[in-house]
Design a protein with these regions (language model features):
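Gly/Trp-centered helix-boundary motif
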Residues: 1-179, 183, 324-348, 352, ...
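Alpha-helical transmembrane segments of integral membrane proteins
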Residues: 149-367
Length: 367
C-alpha cells in the first residue's frame, strides 16, 4: 500500500481516488459517475429564524408593519390621484367664472336626498338665522357644486385639487433639487475634509443665515412670480439641512474598510463618494426628503398667503386659502376643503417619513 501511495502521488486527485478504490475492490469496476456529489436539500436543516434577508426587504416589511406609516401612504396615494384626476371629474375649469352662480353651497347628486349637502345654508339676519338655497332661488336645479362655489362663481372642488397638484409639484421638485445639491455638497465636504471642509462649511453658515423671506422678495423683484420662482427660492435655502446630514454620514463611513479597500485598489475620489459611500447612506437621505416635502408645502402656502406666491388665475393650496379667507365669516364652508387637504397632505408625508426613518435605521430594528 505504501508503494501504491507513492505511485499515486503523481496522479490527479480524482484519478488517484479511483485507482485506490479499484485496488481495494478488484472484483468491481467503478465508474466516475458513482463518485458524483449528490445533493439532497430536504435533509439540510435551515434555521428560519436567522435566514438571510436583504436589507431592503426587511425595511419594506418593517415599514408596512407600522400602521401609521401605511395610513399616511394611503392618504398620499388618494390625494395624488385626486390632484391628477379631480379637476377633470366635472365640467368646470379652475379658472372659469360665472357670477350668476357665486357663493353656492355644496351640493352632491344623490346625497342631497338625505338632507345633507343639498345646497342649503344658514344665513344670519337681523331677526336671527334662516335656511337659504341659492340653487332653488336662482332656478339652478340641474347645477351641482360638490364643494360649493366662491365669490366669483368658480368651482371650489376643481380649484382645490388644481391647487393640490401645483403645491405637490412645487414641493416635490424643490425636495428633489435640494436632495441633489445638498447631498453632493455634504458628501464632497465630508470626504475631503481639512481646508476644503472648513471653507465649504463657512459658506454653508452664510447661506443658512440669510432669511428665506428676503431671498424670495429679491427674486420676485427680478423674476416673474410663479411656480419656477418659488421652486428656485426654496432650492436656495432648503438644501442646507440635507448637506449637513450627508456630511455627517460621510464622516462616519469614509474610514471604513470598504472605503479603504477601494482607495487601495486605485479608485478615484468621486467613484468612492458616489459609488461606494452614497448607496450606504441612501436611507437617511430618503427620510430627509420625505420630511422636507411637507416643509416645502407649508413654506409655499405661507408665501402665497402673504401675496408672494402663485399669481391668479393659477392657484396653489396656499393662494387658494388666501383667496377664500375673506369669505370665512359669511361662507365658512368655502375655506374648509383646501385647509383639510393641505393638513392631510402634510400629516401623511410626516407619517410616511417617520415610518421610513424607523424602517431604514438598523438601530431602531428592535424597538
Amino acid at each position: 500500500m505504501a508503494e501504491k501511495a507513492i505511485r499515486l502521488g503523481g496522479e490527479s486527485t480524482a484519478d488517484a481516488i479511483v485507482s485506490a478504490v479499484d485496488s481495494l475492490y478488484p472484483e468491481h469496476t467503478f465508474e466516475d459517475k458513482e463518485f458524483a456529489l449528490k445533493h439532497n436539500d430536504d435533509e439540510i436543516a435551515v434555521d428560519t429564524n436567522f435566514a438571510a434577508q436583504s436589507f431592503w426587504k426587511d425595511a419594506i416589511l418593517r415599514f408596512f408593519g407600522k400602521r401609521s406609516a401605511v395610513l399616511g401612504l394611503i392618504l398620499i396615494v388618494v390625494i395624488v390621484l385626486l390632484a391628477v384626476f379631480g379637476p377633470g371629474m366635472n365640467s368646470y375649469t379652475y379658472s372659469g367664472q360665472d357670477l350668476s352662480q357665486k357663493n353656492f353651497a355644496p351640493r352632491v347628486p344623490g346625497i342631497e336626498r338625505l338632507g345633507i349637502l343639498d345646497g342649503s345654508e344658514k344665513m344670519s339676519t337681523t331677526t336671527g338665522s334662516k335656511s337659504v338655497n341659492a340653487y332653488v332661488e336662482k332656478g339652478k336645479d340641474d347645477v351641482y357644486y360638490w364643494f360649493g362655489s366662491d365669490l366669483y362663481g368658480r368651482d371650489i372642488w376643481t380649484r382645490t385639487w388644481e391647487g393640490a397638484r401645483v403645491s405637490l409639484i412645487i414641493a416635490v421638485a424643490a425636495a428633489v433639487i435640494d436632495m441633489v445639491i445638498g447631498m453632493s455638497y455634504g458628501l464632497i465636504s465630508g470626504y475631503f475634509g481639512g481646508r476644503v471642509d472648513m471653507v465649504m462649511q463657512r459658506f454653508l453658515e452664510v447661506a443658512n443665515g440669510i432669511p428665506r423671506l428676503v431671498i424670495v422678495t429679491l427674486l420676485l423683484l427680478v423674476l416673474q412670480p410663479g411656480m419656477v420662482t418659488i421652486i428656485f427660492a426654496l432650492m436656495l435655502t432648503e438644501w442646507v439641512g440635507m448637506s449637513r446630514i450627508a456630511r455627517a454620514e460621510m464622516l462616519k463611513l469614509k474610514d471604513q474598510e470598504f472605503v479603504l479597500a477601494s482607495r487601495t485598489l486605485g479608485a478615484g475620489s468621486f467613484f468612492i463618494i458616489f459609488k461606494e459611500v452614497l448607496p450606504n447612506i441612501i436611507g437617511p437621505i430618503i427620510t430627509q426628503v420625505m420630511f422636507s416635502i411637507p416643509t416645502a408645502i407649508f413654506t409655499e402656502a405661507f408665501l402665497s398667503f402673504v401675496g408672494l406666491g402663485i399669481p391668479v388665475p393659477q392657484c396653489s393650496l396656499g393662494s387658494w386659502i388666501s383667496e377664500l379667507y375673506n369669505s370665512f365669516t359669511t361662507h365658512p364652508y368655502q375655506i374648509i376643503p383646501p385647509i383639510v387637504v393641505m393638513s392631510l397632505l402634510m400629516l401623511s408625508f410626516n407619517l410616511v417619513a417617520d415610518g421610513l426613518r424607523e424602517a431604514l435605521d438598523p438601530k431602531m430594528k428592535s424597538m
